[in-house]
Amino acid sequence: MSSPDCGYSSDDQIQGSCSVPMMMGQYQWTEPLTVFQDLKPKRDEGSADSRSKAEGRIRRPMNAFMVWAKDERKRLAQQNPDLHNAELSKMLGKSWKSLTLATKRPFVEEAERLRVQHIQDYPDYKYRPRRKKQVKRMKREEDGFLPSANFPGSQIMDNNVMVGENYRMQYSAQNHQQNQLPPAGYFEGHNSMGYYYRDYSVPNYHISQNSSGYDSPPAQDEYQALSYSFNSSYMPYQQNATTPVMAKQMAVTQNIPQESPEHGMMASPQMYNRQMYVSECAKTHPMAQTEQHFPSYQSQKTVRQNYLQSQQDGHLESDIDKTEFDQYLMYEPKADMEIIYTIDQDSGAYSTNLLPSLITEANNVCYYDYCGV
């Protein structure tokens, strides 16, 4: 073997000396290379200046421990060459504490002499502690050598990881909850049974001047024609959302005795109207079940007369709180969207008067509901 590099170094040197200058000489960007060569001496000069400043810096006078440890450290380093400097410092500290005052006295006197000499040499000296270099500490924190429990500043990397994990967990939990929830606007107003009947098909029984009480509600065919015509597209959602409420209301209405309609009448006219309305909606055959839940017109008239007489006497006004039943109301009819039912006393036929605003409102709602689906 003639050479350790098998002759490759000679070829590289030839190529570097011949071919590279020929190729790079054609371009102008090769000229500033000389600038980098000029920077090297300046860098060396800067390091030399820093060294001279470090050497010219005035050092503090040594104390008694430093005077004793100066020679003792060298001796321990020779005896234990494998020990780190930190371990040597720990051993020196323990040894210094174990020494007696008589043994420490010569080192204390030497430290006092050095202090007096330092004052004489540098009368204007003022101790200025050097700033701690943060470069190494920051580098160690980035590398993760320092534990986060002892050094709060080293929690940067850990916090980033923890924040990312928490964000992922919260984001996944939110997505899971959003996937389980129904579409937006599904539960708006579904707390009550008659949400879709609220504006259009809720009857309002008015006391006519000729009659002395409330008129009986119309037949169920008219209810179905009014209620289901506006909201036929929402029936699947309504059945799913209002099944428990309807079952509860059906149970309440079925438990009311049929032979005593005064029980629901004397409490409040609104309770009577709601019970009659729920019983109508719960039954599918209007003609077969109308007579069971609605008493005859004469009996209703008698009940209404008794109720109005008691209201005029003022016996029930102090005992009944009218606002108590507001929390049980399942619908809130609007004043301008009411359907007024009246009875012709001569013919006994029902007549309905739809307000003009009802027709326009119904058309708008049907259009927006269809577009919203």
Curated annotation (Swiss-Prot):
<dbReference type="GO" id="GO:0007369">
    <property type="term" value="P:gastrulation"/>
</dbReference>
<keyword id="KW-0805">Transcription regulation</keyword>
<feature type="region of interest" description="Required for transcriptional activity and interaction with ctnnb1">
    <location>
        <begin position="324"/>
        <end position="328"/>
    </location>
</feature>
<keyword id="KW-0879">Wnt signaling pathway</keyword>
<keyword id="KW-0238">DNA-binding</keyword>
<comment type="subunit">
    <text>Interacts (via C-terminus) with ctnnb1/beta-catenin (via Armadillo repeats); this interaction is required for inhibition of wnt-signaling.</text>
</comment>
<dbReference type="InterPro" id="IPR036910">
    <property type="entry name" value="HMG_box_dom_sf"/>
</dbReference>
<protein>
    <recommendedName>
        <fullName>Transcription factor Sox-17-beta.1</fullName>
    </recommendedName>
</protein>
<dbReference type="GO" id="GO:0005634">
    <property type="term" value="C:nucleus"/>
</dbReference>
<dbReference type="GO" id="GO:0030178">
    <property type="term" value="P:negative regulation of Wnt signaling pathway"/>
</dbReference>
<dbReference type="GO" id="GO:0045893">
    <property type="term" value="P:positive regulation of DNA-templated transcription"/>
</dbReference>
<feature type="domain" description="Sox C-terminal">
    <location>
        <begin position="256"/>
        <end position="373"/>
    </location>
</feature>
<comment type="function">
    <text>Transcription activator. Doesn't appear to bind to the consensus 5'-AACAAT-3' DNA binding site, but binds 5'-ATTGTT-3'. All of the sox17 proteins are required for embryonic endoderm development and gastrulation movements, and show some redundancy in function. In addition, the sox17 proteins have distinct but overlapping roles in later gut development. Acts downstream of vegt-signaling in endoderm differentiation to induce a range of endodermal genes both directly and indirectly. Also represses wnt-responsive genes to inhibit wnt/beta-catenin-mediated signaling.</text>
</comment>
<dbReference type="GO" id="GO:0008013">
    <property type="term" value="F:beta-catenin binding"/>
</dbReference>
<dbReference type="GO" id="GO:0001228">
    <property type="term" value="F:DNA-binding transcription activator activity, RNA polymerase II-specific"/>
</dbReference>
<dbReference type="Pfam" id="PF00505">
    <property type="entry name" value="HMG_box"/>
</dbReference>
<keyword id="KW-0010">Activator</keyword>
<dbReference type="GO" id="GO:0030154">
    <property type="term" value="P:cell differentiation"/>
</dbReference>
<dbReference type="InterPro" id="IPR021934">
    <property type="entry name" value="Sox_C"/>
</dbReference>
<dbReference type="InterPro" id="IPR050140">
    <property type="entry name" value="SRY-related_HMG-box_TF-like"/>
</dbReference>
<dbReference type="GO" id="GO:0045944">
    <property type="term" value="P:positive regulation of transcription by RNA polymerase II"/>
</dbReference>
<dbReference type="GO" id="GO:0016055">
    <property type="term" value="P:Wnt signaling pathway"/>
</dbReference>
<dbReference type="GO" id="GO:0000978">
    <property type="term" value="F:RNA polymerase II cis-regulatory region sequence-specific DNA binding"/>
</dbReference>
<feature type="short sequence motif" description="9aaTAD">
    <location>
        <begin position="323"/>
        <end position="331"/>
    </location>
</feature>
<dbReference type="GO" id="GO:0000122">
    <property type="term" value="P:negative regulation of transcription by RNA polymerase II"/>
</dbReference>
<keyword id="KW-0306">Gastrulation</keyword>
<dbReference type="GO" id="GO:0007492">
    <property type="term" value="P:endoderm development"/>
</dbReference>
<feature type="DNA-binding region" description="HMG box">
    <location>
        <begin position="58"/>
        <end position="126"/>
    </location>
</feature>
<keyword id="KW-0217">Developmental protein</keyword>
<dbReference type="InterPro" id="IPR009071">
    <property type="entry name" value="HMG_box_dom"/>
</dbReference>
<dbReference type="GO" id="GO:0043565">
    <property type="term" value="F:sequence-specific DNA binding"/>
</dbReference>
<dbReference type="GO" id="GO:0007494">
    <property type="term" value="P:midgut development"/>
</dbReference>
<keyword id="KW-0804">Transcription</keyword>
<keyword id="KW-0539">Nucleus</keyword>
